[in-house]
Design a protein with these regions (language model features):
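Bacterial N-terminal signal peptides that target proteins for export
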Residues: 4-20
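Bacterial N-terminal signal peptides
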Residues: 19-27
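Sec/Tat signal peptide C-region and signal peptidase I cleavage site
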Residues: 28-32
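Flexible, processing/modification-adjacent segments and terminal tails
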Residues: 33-48, 58, 66, 75-153, ...
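Extended beta-sheet lipid-handling architectures
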Residues: 53-56, 67-69, 84, 187-189, ...
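Sequence/structural signature of outer-membrane beta-barrel proteins
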Residues: 61-63, 192
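Gly/Pro-enriched, hydrophobic low-complexity segments
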Residues: 125-242
């Protein structure tokens, strides 16, 4: 009788563990579906913007560099044409073509979305979602998005690439939020991945000139901030702008 009772208890325990495992797997699958749906909702919102021309102020904060705040013009044309031009004719070209374009964060449609909990960005609650490209040859290895689920806005994104290191973007939104376009973008990166624009000069704190600019920039952190004051959306942008 005791043996039967033990066997029955063992069977019930194994059955319970199997049910828990199945429930956990089903729950993970549903969560993955939910975050994929959220990413696609954000993509649909950004896809409403076919092109824009924006103006704003650009501030560069990089060690050993003297870069004044500049007025800039920014152009975008779907799906991946993007250019920043400083007034005076100097184009700003981060190494590898790193872009402040929101749509570039969701360029690939071949990805696996993995839920990674919740967090807060600038006091706003967000869903944390990791995007893993299914293409083994893709330059992007991992993108972590912090999405405001209620407003369908990307408030922060951290991207790791094969060729250009890891960079982070944090966004603030205002009147252009319904288009998914930020009022402010702060772009943080490792300075070894940054290509110096023409006309930028070094400032030396010790009076001693370093061996090379590359040595001065090695293992330093940099930030580029753009504060937009206006966008002209879906009014057409000539292809000549990008040449």
């Amino acid at each position: 009788m005791r043996r039967l009772t033990y066997r029955a208890a063992s069977f019930l325990m194994r059955k319970s563990l199997a049910n828990i495992l199945l429930f956990s797997m089903a729950s993970l699958h549903l969560h993955a579906q939910d975050v994929t749906t959220l990413v696609n909702r954000v993509r649909t919102k950004l896809d409403k913007v076919k092109d824009y021309h924006a103006t704003g102020d650009l501030k560069t904060d990089v060690a050993f560099l003297k870069v004044p705040v500049s007025r800039v013009n920014v152009w975008y044309k779907s799906p991946d044409r993007f250019r920043i031009k400083k007034e005076g004719g100097i184009s700003l070209l981060p190494k590898g073509g790193l872009s402040f374009n929101m749509r570039s964060l969701l360029m690939t449609e071949n990805f696996t979305a993995v839920p990674a909990g919740e967090s807060s960005v600038g006091g706003q609650p967000t869903k944390v979602i990791k995007l893993l490209p299914t293409d083994d040859d893709a330059d992007i290895i991992l993108t972590t998005l912090y999405i405001d689920e209620k407003l369908e806005l990307i408030r922060r994104a951290t991207t790791t690439t094969r060729e250009n290191g890891t960079y982070d973007m944090q966004m603030d939104y205002g009147r252009y939020g319904p288009w998914g376009l930020p009022d402010k973008v702060v772009f943080s990166f490792n300075t070894k991945d940054y290509k110096l624009p023409k006309g930028v000069t070094f400032e030396y704190e010790t009076g001693e000139k370093p061996a090379t600019p590359e040595e001065q920039l090695r293992n330093k952190k940099g930030k580029v901030e753009i504060r937009y004051d206006s966008y002209t959306i879906n009014q057409g942008v000539p292809e000549s702008v990008f040449k």
